[in-house]
């Protein structure tokens, strides 16, 4: 579980490696919001339109967890290397740059629909980076379904929701790591270089590959010791898809997934820039303690301490140890927030996003395992999502002139959004085995990820387009008005809320068992 979580931790960092430096991409590479959003959405383009994710599910069912995990890590590394070269200085002025400038300027059908993965006027570096990100996206989504399948293999009938929640909580620390270190490497030494941030991500993808290989041999050794063959599902048949697609519960869970994740992951890619636009941030004096690079490292170590103590508190049997660790974790979190305020750094403010998730996801997972109520948790998650996006849209801008008030509201809202994000992996993913036959779980997860990927491709692109349309003539990347994109994301939360109520009714009528505990 730890090896799989660490591999996903590295992939989560690379997934959002450019998100906290959107302003620098506009200043140094000429990427406007449309180019940035189009590149970010490209991550899942092949998964959606080449149906790669469906094939990934078939590979997983046929070849097993070990092989598919290593394959996904190799694919991620190839895509990461291409993306690094695309934003590196050596790409500028190359023959490859000239080719991309002159080609991929019109994609039939997509151009007419206004959602083309490439378009005339899109910077060549953004086009080539999008190609690399498409390949990376194939690997990361394959890894996602493989990890879910691996956890089902080891934890079915036991604390499966706790295991999935714990894996996602640890992996999501990658988001915070990315938010802190991507700008750190980009500005290291006083000279801006966006390629340094991506190079940092490439190194981490090499580590993810090593983790996957270690998992391969450890899992094989364990199977040899127990005398079990690696669990592979029955040969894939088209009729299996029919079995999955005829389940109304499956469709409701899949639609909930696409609505919910589309309101979170695309938002992450713009969140730092949104804070830069809505907060009054004054950079500390260059000679002050808070401007030193060492402070970034210290703040990150405190963040890890918050996560470690909060996570560990879930597994203490003695009340004294449990609440003691919890208090220490909260004190460390307050210290982290104070440092973010003193540094006046939008990226370190948003980095608190997964911290509450790390603390409460295992609690929620354990609750679903022993008490149930998965459908109710999905409804609660949707309510929190709506509240947070509307707060960002209408309340946060009111405090733009207030140095303390704006940052305080930002911290609270981001932490609540992170907690709403915890409700989904702890309740949604463990529900899938209740909806489909065990032999097609790999394909079922792949189908859900494919449906989810439609939203993850479309909404980064839409946010970028809406930003450019509602901010005509704005060239300063810290002066955008984010109201319209945030209202759009809140609308997704409303749709998810309605579907949550429908799911609860269907569960009660058909006895799907979503409200029942995983451990009986």
Annotated model-derived regions:
Residues 18-22, 247-312, 332-357, 361, ...:
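Extracytoplasmic gate region of multi-pass secondary transporters
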Residues 41-58, 351-364:
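Central cavity-lining transmembrane alpha-helices of secondary-active solute carriers
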Residues 50-97:
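Conserved MFS/SLC helix-loop-helix module at the cytosolic interface between two early adjacent transmembrane helices
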Residues 61-73, 316-324, 369-383:
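Cytoplasmic membrane-interface "Motif A"-like loop-to-helix N-cap segments
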Residues 99-100, 216-240, 510-519:
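Flexible cytoplasmic inter-helical loops of multi-pass small-molecule transporters
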Residues 126, 132-170:
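Cytoplasmic helix-loop-helix junction between adjacent transmembrane helices
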Residues 167-220:
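Helix-loop-helix hairpin linking two adjacent transmembrane segments in secondary transporters
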Residues 328-340, 345, 351-356, 374-428:
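C-terminal transmembrane helical hairpin of 12-TM major facilitator-type secondary transporters
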């Amino acid at each position: 579980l730890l090896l799989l979580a660490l591999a996903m931790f590295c992939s989560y960092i690379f997934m959002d490696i450019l998100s906290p430096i959107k302003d620098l991409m506009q200043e140094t590479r000429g990427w406007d919001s449309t180019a940035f959003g189009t590149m970010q959405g490209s991550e899942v383009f092949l998964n959606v339109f080449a149906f790669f994710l469906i094939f990934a599910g078939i590979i997983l069912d046929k070849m097993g967890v070990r092989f598919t995990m290593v394959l996904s890590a190799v694919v991620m590394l190839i895509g990461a290397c291409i993306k690094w070269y695309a934003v590196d200085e050596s790409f500028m002025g190359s023959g490859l740059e000239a080719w991309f400038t002159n080609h991929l300027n019109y994609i039939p059908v997509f151009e007419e629909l206004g959602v083309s993965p490439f378009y005339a006027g899109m910077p060549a570096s953004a086009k080539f980076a999008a190609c690399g990100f498409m390949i990376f996206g194939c690997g990361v989504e394959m890894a996602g379904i493989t990890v879910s399948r691996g956890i089902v293999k080891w934890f079915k009938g036991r604390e499966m929701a706790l295991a999935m929640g714990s894996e996602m909580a640890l992996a999501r620390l990658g988001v915070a790591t990315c938010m802190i270190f991507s700008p750190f490497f980009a500005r290291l030494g006083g000279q801006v270089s966006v390629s340094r941030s991506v190079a940092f991500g490439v190194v981490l993808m090499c580590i993810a590959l090593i983790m996957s290989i270690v998992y391969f041999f450890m899992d094989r050794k364990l199977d040899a010791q127990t005398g079990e063959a690696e669990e592979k599902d029955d040969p894939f048949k088209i009729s299996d898809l029919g079995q999955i697609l005829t389940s109304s519960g499956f469709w409701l869970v899949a639609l909930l997934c696409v609505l919910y994740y589309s309101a979170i992951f695309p938002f992450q890619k713009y969140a730092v820039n949104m804070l830069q636009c809505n907060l009054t941030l004054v950079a500390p004096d260059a000679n002050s303690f808070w401007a030193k690079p060492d402070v970034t490292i210290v703040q990150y170590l405190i963040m890890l301490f918050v996560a470690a103590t909060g996570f560990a508190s879930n597994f203490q049997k003695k009340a004294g140890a449990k609440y003691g660790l919890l208090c220490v974790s909260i004190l460390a979190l307050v210290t982290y927030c104070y440092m973010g305020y003193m540094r006046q750094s939008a990226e370190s403010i948003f980095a608190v996003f997964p911290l509450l998730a790390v603390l409460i996801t295992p609690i929620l997972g354990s609750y679903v395992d022993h008490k149930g109520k998965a459908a109710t948790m999905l409804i609660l998650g949707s309510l929190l999502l709506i509240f947070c996006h509307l707060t960002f849209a209408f309340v946060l801008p009111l405090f733009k002139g207030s140095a303390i008030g704006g940052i305080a509201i930002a911290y609270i809202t981001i932490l609540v959004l992170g907690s709403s994000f915890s409700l989904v992996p702890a309740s949604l993913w463990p529900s899938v085995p209740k909806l489909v036959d065990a032999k097609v779980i790999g394909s079922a997860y792949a189908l859900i990820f494919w449906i989810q990927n439609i939203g993850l491709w479309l909404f980064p692109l839409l946010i970028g387009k809406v930003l450019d349309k509602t901010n005509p003539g704005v060239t300063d990347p810290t002066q955008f008005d984010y109201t319209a994109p945030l209202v759009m994301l809140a609308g997704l939360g409303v749709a998810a809320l309605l579907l949550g109520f429908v799911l609860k009714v269907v569960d009660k009528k058909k006895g799907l068992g979503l409200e029942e505990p995983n451990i009986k």
